[in-house]
Amino acid sequence: MATSHRVAKLVASSLQTPVNPITGARVAQYEREDPLKALAAAEAILEDEEEEKVAQPAGASADLNTSFSGVDEHAPISYEDFVNFPDIHHSNEEYFKKVEELKAAHIETMAKLEKMYQDKLHLKEVQPVVIREDSLSDSSRSVSEKNSYHPVSLMTSFSEPDLGQSSSLYVSSSEEELPNLEKEYPRKNRMMTYAKELINNMWTDFCVEDYIRCKDTGFHAAEKRRKKRKEWVPTITVPEPFQMMIREQKKKEESMKSKSDIEMVHKALKKQEEDPEYKKKFRANPVPASVFLPLYHDLVKQKEERRRSLKEKSKEALLASQKPFKFIAREEQKRAAREKQLRDFLKYKKKTNRFKARPIPRSTYGSTTNDKLKEEELYRNLRTQLRAQEHLQNSSPLPCRSACGCRNPRCPEQAVKLKCKHKVRCPTPDFEDLPERYQKHLSEHKSPKLLTVCKPFDLHASPHASIKREKILADIEADEENLKETRWPYLSPRRKSPVRCAGVNPVPCNCNPPVPTVSSRGREQAVRKSEKERMREYQRELEEREEKLKKRPLLFERVAQKNARMAAEKHYSNTLKALGISDEFVSKKGQSGKVLEYFNNQETKSVTEDKESFNEEEKIEERENGEENYFIDTNSQDSYKEKDEANEESEEEKSVEESH
């Protein structure tokens, strides 16, 4: 880790963009000097240094740490001034070998230095200081950092895997320049050998004493080298456009071409394509002999024949699959049956002898029978009148209640109560006028029977409007009754408060309800029995109606019967007319009149039955709509009243008979 960190640190310090020594600004890629020219300048400088080394070897070895190539240490030196990167980058293995050799040489020098230091201490008779490996490695690292030259260490950094980003930076910046330089300068191998020699000769003539010398000597040597520095020669950079700029310019030129040029090019291309077509010559083949044959007419005939045959086949298939409607076949059968019946009837009529009526006896035209009938009616009326008078004379009034014997009371108190009870409070009625009076009373107080009223049809559309109208009217009435007046005298409720009668006493809440008597219980039982009987009768009537409806023929059957009857009557009347017999003569003399009357009666009966069934159906629907309970209540009340009236009448008749 320490070695890799050290190498990375060296590379990071060496990766600096070159700076213009005059202006101090960083130099762009296209403004930099040519690396080959920089190498040539470096060679010249090295030659000068070698000459100086011959003259002053001590000064050159002492200043190795500050300036290796004779350039001022304060001036930024770019790696392109000394090394051509593509000449060295391809040999990583050689580079690592050289680095290992340098490391071994460095270790040897440090060992020598340690030995010299111990010898010096031994001479001075001083105990040696224990030096740890860490401090030794640090000292060796510092010495190596002093001795290492940044441009040379740059060559190692680009082959290391940890420094891929830094290498990519340089490669991307100089990948357009290096191929051109390799083409222009074939002296690549010579420069490569020079770089290798430079690396090999780095540790030659190395001496530790050069580092122990005074700083003055290094200062004087630096001043001398500053005087010998070459001046910076400005170079003119020729700007070259980028490939993308050239590409965009070509696109613009192509787009700037006029449409006429494009059309001309297209026309020229079309001409080139059409010229060989025009040059071709057409030569028609001879007409074949099959064309002159009348094949078309034969084909048309075959099509017509095929079409006709298909049409006939389809018609036959349709006729075979065709079936008449069922009702048509049924009507035809009925018609045939009727015709057969008429034929049989006419044959039977022809065979039978004609009817001849006997003459009416003369006794029927006499007056004896009528006189006898009238006399019998008179005798009957006289008998009824006489019987009525006898009944009236023999009738007597009801015996007095006091005359009837009563039970002997056990206690005297009960006897007093019974005497008080049997006191006559009203005079005896006139029994001759009682029936008429009762009839009047019953006719006045008898509750009329409620008749069923047909309701209109409840359609889904009509009730909405009527319900809304009723609600609006009810709201108006409620507002008129409850809301306050808006004008003087501002009476709070519009409806009049009900005036309470003075004679009406409030019924106390704590009073016990009346105890039912024996007569009330009997009445309730009678009402229940009558209701049950009425319900049974009602159920019986419903069942009878349902049976009638089930047994009754359907409407179309009745219509068919009626039509058949009318047709038979018409046929019969036509035959009579054809024979010269009138209908009146037949109705008077023959049995045909009775037959016709029977048919007419049957028709009237059927019509009445239809009407009755229709009315019964309507009544059933009304009862199903919710009137059954009301109907039962009213009928039960009527039956109960009728029973009471019948009982009263029977009691009155008994009283009249007893009085007579």
Curated annotation (Swiss-Prot):
Compositional bias per record (Acidic residues), positions renumbered to this chain: 645-660
Q: One cellular component GO annotation, for this chain's record?
A: Golgi apparatus
Keyword Ubl conjugation set for record: yes
Q: Where in the cell is it found?
A: Cytoplasm, Cytoskeleton, Cilium basal body; Cell projection, Cilium; Cytoplasm, Cytoskeleton, Microtubule organizing center, Centrosome, Centriole
Q: Which gene encodes it?
A: FAM161A
- Tissue range of expression? Isoform 1 and isoform 3 are widely expressed with highest levels in retina and testis, with isoform 1 being the most abundant in all tissues tested.
Cross-link for Glycyl lysine isopeptide (Lys-Gly) (interchain with G-Cter in SUMO2), residue positions: 468, 484
The record's GO molecular-function terms, alphabetically, read: identical protein binding; microtubule binding
What InterPro entries does the record tag this protein with?
Answer: FAM161 (IPR051655), FAM161A/B (IPR019579)
**What disease has this protein been linked to?**
Retinitis pigmentosa 28: A retinal dystrophy belonging to the group of pigmentary retinopathies. Retinitis pigmentosa is characterized by retinal pigment deposits visible on fundus examination and primary loss of rod photoreceptor cells followed by secondary loss of cone photoreceptors. Patients typically have night vision blindness and loss of midperipheral visual field. As their condition progresses, they lose their far peripheral visual field and eventually central vision as well.
Which region ranges are annotated with the description Required for interaction with CFAP418?
Answer: 341-525
Instruction: Recite the UniProt keywords alphabetically.
Output: Cell projection, Ciliopathy, Cilium, Cilium biogenesis/degradation, Coiled coil, Cytoplasm, Cytoskeleton, Disease variant, Isopeptide bond, Retinitis pigmentosa, Sensory transduction, Ubl conjugation, Vision
Give the protein name, as stated in the record: Protein FAM161A
One GO term of the biological process aspect: visual perception
Disordered: annotated span: 605-660
UniProt function note: Involved in ciliogenesis.
User: Which parts form a coiled-coil structure per UniProt?
Assistant: 93-120, 296-320, 522-552
Query: The organism's lineage?
Result: Eukaryota, Metazoa, Chordata, Craniata, Vertebrata
